[in-house]
């Protein structure tokens, strides 16, 4: 699917971030599969402390098509205020911010929340990246 963003600098940044995120998917899946096989975690159960520690430095990002859908949904709704729970490294937040920007509304705002301080710091750096 072609990108709806029409912003080459942002698209380049997101391309890099999506590649980094995709590189972690197999390791993350293997970690949870191994935990299930070991009997230390049942399928479809809430995350325990070990899982939280494992994920604390991982990108937990929407796939590109889902992030683009969120962008298009915010555009269609002419969203001016968006709250995201679980910003992680800020990939989906960049899509949400682009939608609010492209809606050309006064006083638009995107609020991202993140539990892990190091992820929040990386997200802030991604928001400041030239895009």
Question: What is the predicted role of each segment?
Answer:
Residues 1-131:
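A short alpha-helical cap/connector motif
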């Amino acid at each position: 699917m072609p990108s709806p963003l029409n912003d080459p600098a942002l698209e380049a940044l997101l391309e890099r971030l999506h590649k980094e995120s995709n590189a972690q998917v197999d390791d993350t899946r293997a970690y949870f599969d191994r935990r299930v096989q070991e009997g230390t975690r049942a399928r479809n159960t809430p995350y325990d402390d070990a899982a939280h520690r494992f994920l604390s430095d991982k990108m937990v990002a929407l796939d590109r098509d889902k992030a683009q859908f969120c962008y298009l949904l915010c555009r269609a709704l002419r969203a001016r205020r968006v709250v995201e729970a679980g910003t992680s490294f800020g990939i989906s937040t960049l899509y949400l911010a682009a939608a609010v920007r492209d809606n050309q509304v006064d006083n638009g705002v995107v609020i991202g929340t993140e539990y892990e301080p190091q992820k929040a710091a990386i997200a802030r750096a991604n928001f400041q990246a030239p895009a």
